[in-house]
Amino acid sequence: MRVDAILSNLNLDANIYELESNYQGNILHVMREDALAYSFGGNKVRIAIELFEDLKRKNCDCIISYGGRGSNLNRVIANMAFNQRIPCYVIVSETEGDQFFESINDKMVRLSHAKVINCKKKDVLKTVVQVFEMCNQK
């Protein structure tokens, strides 16, 4: 599924609701990012769409994401990359105790066939540079 197909299937405005009550005469609206019908929703879907549109504009063929084991953005990017058949590398910074922790987002990243690269927090920059150079060689 291409980014265009994802965008055409998502109504990003459909999740704005007018509240029944008002505040001091003001009509209030809420945006339900969690109701976006892609990768369990959230504002990270909007961010990922922008990233993939930028990736497309620049003719890139690989995406790198960074975050912790519970990262919503990693989940959405890995899922979107899988749907578009784009190689995805997810750099996960580990803190003490993380090796015993696996979040739902972590599982979903792995199910999306993203290449997960674990590193210590102090090595994030070095790891990002290494993965970037590896992607540029392909």
Regions found by a protein language model. Name each.
Residues 1-138:
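PLP-dependent amino-acid enzyme catalytic core
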